[in-house]
């Protein structure tokens, strides 16, 4: 055996073995239990970052653990390779997105291989290839045929100077990133998929996701946002028009003092003809990119329209205001305002001098709305015939009256909106729809799929090449001239079904149902919690679409979800001569000084600049505090990086990158290597004979099997990889102190090392592969079984009992494991230390906690 641990040499040899033997390639096997382990696939940005490494190490640990459980394990990888960053890079590098993307894929693929991840590379997919997006296009046409796809106008960011649509990322301080022209909101036709048709099922099935984090489930419930309420009709005074409003608080209807409508509401447009102030306000709102999320913090503003709404019960007239906090694309575009019982309405009413009336009060007292709205549920008053009713009775009575008079209906609403999948970008899958000469819009016929995205293009930074090239759109369908859709799919489309394509990546159909139903659902999915409400919801939605198309037979795409925390690193900067911050990589910090609590108080970089330390923050390009995984692998080896990633923090919490911790992980591997090297050079001919073991040998063997039990539970059930590593480290400490003088000493250490290399195999597979062979095993570690606990080894011949006198530990005694209270008490009382502390006292009570504690109370 090689005496020194040389990671680069070992890892290259082991990775070559895996590659040559196609170790991780799998096929369906009805005789084996399957396990599908999947980490969210990366965008090929150019280089892996530590966030990737953490995600993929967790996935690899789970996959390798399950493999040693004897399961048929699928762990695939691919590339989420469409998207705006490729367009921006192509513009900056004067190239096309395709070659930039494919070069990055090759580079990052090699990085993944260097880290030793056990992927089935034969299933690799890239979503930007026609072989992949062809089936996405095909499926979209099927959804259209089922009535689940439609087209309507929706607002986009529009640069009037370049006459092009901008992504949200391309709007900087309300202006175009390229020409600094103020951005407008423009309504253009776009394609939508009816996710709302599945809202109820998506919500209800959250209750079946037992293996998903509660936080993700709560976020999805809130995002779907089911509410029960009443949709009611308000008339418009002096007009033959009416409009609808939805509310979840009909009990407050008698307190409505004004109505707020979106600036884009038809009533606002009508009123603006004779109201210049309102017309200007509408134009201003049109050009603001207010998202629903920003509404909570923005200044609430409005303009009176001059119109009045007719209260559906009292007939009273209340003013209609156009307000910037009402969105036309959310609900009906109008809200009833009850400033006495809604804080936003209260503040708006105070600002503009509108009436505030209280109609709800606490059950046991009066209500004061002089300083703030009373927003709790309570008892109705000032509400005419409804006075004295509580929330539920008031809700029902008012709802029933509105329904009976034909002025309203009970309704279940969802916050969830239909999925807009159109993007006015180039680097995405073309939407497979065509417009015939007579204006009819139809799906592209199946025999004309895929609609190919041309890859040999020139990016001018203004318009999508397929929009600029008028010839590209021209086609023929059934002998008629037609024009192709020039929008491309939202890239969430590709990531919504990739997990299923891995099951049959080379099939000449979207999915091979037999293969898909063997592997699906995914047993373990791993990715960041930031994807909770977008990707993970579309992921679930698409699975139900696939099910209803007869392609899969399960209801949900993944049984278990692990959301790993972010990777943080120290961040430093200095101020340059221009007064700007220059962020310095932690690798370029030459010296640091720390206080007695270990906090950095002073830092100087390699160029002598005194640095400001801003603490730990998420690794990012903007703060230049990302650590290149490749640099760490070259310095310490992949196994060290993997071990640190698993040991430094529980998986769902943030991980603080500390090179001192990486060095500690490296030292541990060297200790393991040294112990194994010493062992293989011993005479190990004597087989383990448990019947001849001394008490010390039994105690050491007990530690081995306790560790097997703990690590098995920590990795397999609890997914607490850090405590699993800690348990093995503790066992290593016992082994290093253990004698190696007899044949049975060596036999126990041999058993322990055999267990340790398998327990650590998921985490440090290269070292484990090598040591497994050095320990004399004929087959490779991938073909071995996870170590099994010997229950007999856990049985203790004796117990160490703590003896307390009046609450203080005074002695520790060893007793037979099956000793009764009387014998333990007798032994404890006869201990010389106990006798000393009982001298002159009378024993009043003795408490025995079996196998742990003897407590003596005396005075």
Curated annotation (Swiss-Prot):
Reactions catalysed according to its record: tRNA(Leu) + L-leucine + ATP = L-leucyl-tRNA(Leu) + AMP + diphosphate
Motif 'HIGH' region per record, residues: 42-52
Positions that bind ATP: 621
Motif 'KMSKS' region, residue range(s) on this chain: 618-622
Keywords: Aminoacyl-tRNA synthetase, ATP-binding, Cytoplasm, Ligase, Nucleotide-binding, Protein biosynthesis
E.C. designation(s): 6.1.1.4
InterPro entries tied to this protein: aa-tRNA-synth_I_CS, aa-tRNA-synth_Ia, Leu-tRNA-ligase, Leu_tRNA-synth_edit, M/V/L/I-tRNA-synth_anticd-bd, Methionyl/Leucyl_tRNA_Synth, Rossmann-like_a/b/a_fold, tRNAsynth_Ia_anticodon-bd
Keyword Lipid metabolism: no
Localization, UniProt: Cytoplasm
A GO CC annotation given for this chain: cytosol
GO molecular function: aminoacyl-tRNA deacylase activity; ATP binding; leucine-tRNA ligase activity
Keyword Nucleotide-binding: yes
GO term, biological process aspect, one: leucyl-tRNA aminoacylation
Entry-linked NCBIfam families: leuS_bact (TIGR00396)
Family the entry assigns: Belongs to the class-I aminoacyl-tRNA synthetase family.
Stated name of the protein: Leucine--tRNA ligase
Gene (name only): leuS
């Amino acid at each position: 055996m090689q005496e020194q641990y040389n990671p680069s040499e070992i890892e290259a040899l082991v990775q070559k073995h895996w590659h040559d033997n196609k170790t991780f390639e799998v096929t369906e096997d009805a005789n084996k239990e399957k396990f599908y382990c999947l980490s969210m696939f990366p965008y090929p940005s150019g280089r892996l970052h530590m966030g990737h490494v953490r995600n993929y190490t967790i996935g690899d640990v789970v996959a390798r653990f399950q493999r040693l459980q004897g399961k048929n394990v699928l762990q695939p990888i691919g590339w989420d390779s469409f998207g705006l960053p490729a367009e921006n890079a192509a513009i900056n590098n004067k190239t096309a997105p395709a070659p930039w993307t494919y070069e990055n894929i090759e580079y990052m693929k090699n990085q993944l291989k260097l880290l030793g991840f056990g992927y089935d590379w034969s299933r690799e997919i890239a979503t930007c290839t026609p072989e992949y997006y062809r089936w996405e296009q095909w499926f979209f046409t099927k959804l259209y045929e089922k009535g689940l796809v439609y087209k309507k106008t929706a607002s986009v960011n529009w640069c009037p100077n370049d006459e092009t649509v901008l992504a949200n990322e391309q709007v900087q301080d309300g202006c175009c990133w390229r020409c600094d022209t103020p951005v407008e909101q423009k309504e253009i036709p776009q394609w939508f998929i009816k996710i709302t048709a599945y809202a109820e099922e998506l919500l209800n099935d959250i209750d079946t996701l037992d293996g998903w984090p509660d936080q993700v489930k709560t976020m999805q419930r809130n995002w779907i946002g089911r509410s029960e309420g009443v949709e009611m009709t308000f008339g418009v005074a002096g007009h033959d028009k009416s409009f609808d409003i939805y509310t979840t608080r009909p009990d407050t209807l008698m307190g409505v003092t004004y109505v707020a409508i979106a600036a884009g509401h038809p009533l606002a447009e009508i009123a603006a003809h004779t109201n210049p102030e309102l017309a200007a306000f509408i134009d201003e709102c049109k050009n603001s990119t207010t998202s629903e999320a920003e509404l909570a913090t923005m200044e609430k503003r409005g303009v009176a329209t001059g119109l009045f709404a007719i209260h559906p019960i009292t007939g009273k007239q209340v003013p209609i205001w156009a307000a910037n906090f009402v969105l036309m694309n959310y609900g009906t575009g109008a809200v009833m305002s009850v400033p006495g019982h809604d804080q936003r309405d209260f503040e708006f009413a105070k600002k503009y001098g509108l009436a505030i009336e209280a109609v709800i009060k606490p059950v046991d007292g009066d209500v004061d709305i002089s300083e703030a709205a009373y927003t709790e549920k309570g008892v109705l008053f000032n509400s005419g015939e409804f006075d004295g009713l509580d929330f539920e009775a008031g809700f029902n009575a008012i709802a029933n009256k509105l329904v009976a008079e034909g002025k309203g209906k009970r309704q279940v609403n969802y916050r969830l909106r239909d999925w807009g999948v159109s993007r006015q970008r180039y680097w995405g899958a073309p939407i497979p729809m065509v417009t015939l000469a007579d204006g009819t819009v139809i799906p592209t016929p199946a025999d004309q799929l895929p609609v190919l995205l041309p890859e040999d293009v020139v990016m001018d930074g203004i318009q999508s090449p397929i929009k600029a090239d008028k010839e590209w759109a021209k086609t023929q369908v059934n002998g008629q001239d037609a024009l192709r859709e020039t929008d491309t799919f939202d890239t969430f489309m590709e990531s919504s079904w990739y997990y299923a394509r891995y099951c049959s990546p080379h099939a000449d159909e979207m999915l091979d149902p037999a293969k898909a139903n063997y592997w699906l659902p995914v047993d373990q999915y791993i990715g960041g919690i930031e994807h909770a409400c977008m990707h993970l919801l579309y992921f679930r939605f698409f699975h139900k679409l696939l099910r209803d198309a007869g392609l899969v037979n399960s209801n949900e795409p993944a049984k278990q979800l692990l959301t790993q925390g972010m990777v943080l690193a120290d961040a430093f900067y200095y101020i340059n001569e221009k007064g700007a911050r220059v962020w310095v990589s932690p690798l370029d910090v030459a010296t640091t000084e720390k206080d007695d609590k270990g906090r950095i108080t002073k830092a100087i970089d390699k160029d002598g600049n005194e640095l400001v330390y801003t603490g730990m923050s998420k690794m990012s390009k903007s703060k230049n505090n990302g650590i290149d995984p490749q640099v760490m692998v070259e310095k310490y080896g992949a196994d060290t990086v993997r071990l640190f990633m698993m040991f430094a923090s529980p998986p769902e919490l943030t991980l603080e990158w500390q090179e001192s911790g990486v060095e500690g992980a490296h030292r541990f591997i060297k200790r393991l290597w040294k112990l194994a090297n010493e062992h293989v050079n011993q005479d190990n001919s004597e087989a383990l004979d448990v019947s001849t073991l001394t008490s010390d040998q039994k105690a050491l063997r007990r530690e081995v099997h306790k560790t097997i039990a703990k690590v098995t539970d920590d990795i397999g059930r609890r997914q607490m990889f850090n405590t699993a590593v800690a348990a093995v480290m503790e066992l290593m400490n016992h082994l290093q102190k253990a004698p190696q003088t007899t044949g049975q000493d060596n036999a126990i250490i041999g058993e322990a090392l055999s267990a340790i290399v398998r327990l650590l195999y998921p985490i440090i597979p290269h070292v484990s592969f090598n040591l497994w062979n050095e320990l004399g095993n004929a087959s490779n570690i991938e073909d071995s079984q996870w170590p099994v606990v010997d229950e007999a080894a856990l049985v203790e011949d004796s117990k160490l009992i703590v003896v307390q006198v009046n609450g203080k530990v005074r002695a520790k005694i060893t007793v037979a494991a099956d000793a009764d209270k009387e014998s333990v008490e007798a032994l404890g009382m006869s201990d010389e230390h106990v006798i000393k502390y009982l001298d002159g006292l009378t024993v009043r009570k003795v408490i025995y906690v079996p196998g742990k504690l003897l407590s003596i109370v005396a005075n």
